[in-house]
Amino acid sequence: MNEFLNEAKAGAKAWLVKAGTSLAVILLVVIGARVYSSSKSAESVIDNPTEEAITFKLDGKDYTLEPKTSQVIKLSKGEHTLEYLGETTKFTKKAPKFLDTDYSIINPTKSLYVLYNEIYGENLTETEADEKSSTYDCEDDQGKPDKCPRKFLSDVFIQESVDYGLDEATPDNVDVAKSTRYTIKKKLFRGDDFSKYMGADSEDVILEPVEVK
């Protein structure tokens, strides 16, 4: 009997050690992801998509950006001040949400950007794809309230949760769980890049999934 109890205790101890190790691994993964997310969220992209060089001040520091260029800087959360062409604008960078794919742009020229819901799905009709990806408020051709897969942005400071930033290409394929049949990835475009991406006659893009699980 004692031998049986000892074996049971040893087995329980081994299980606890294994469970503890698994929990520790999970915690390390979560913490690592959080640190990576916070590190990326601390960065902001100053972007100049125009044909002219621009000069401005951010929090009292002078910057010059050549045409069609950008610069990545560290920008802390809180209030900041931008001075451009005699106009002073104050904006606030929010703290990122837990494990959020936070992305921010400083847009001195107030140029147009587009946040687009790219849908990847299996056996989806164009109507289904449009309904599932249209999560942003917009207006239809008659000016009535509607839902669209894109959101237009032109603020001095843009902060959004995205999967792909300005210079990151969307993949041709992504993994899609069988239980959902589709997934949506958010991509942020410069206005001109979005027009080229969509094409003159296209309204939406439906991409094929890979390794449907």
Regions from the language model: what does each represent?
Residues N2-S22, L28-P67, K74, L85, ...:
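Short loop/turn and low-complexity linker motifs enriched in small/turn-promoting residues
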Residues K77-E79:
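Extracellular Ig-like/FN3 beta-sandwich strand-entry sites
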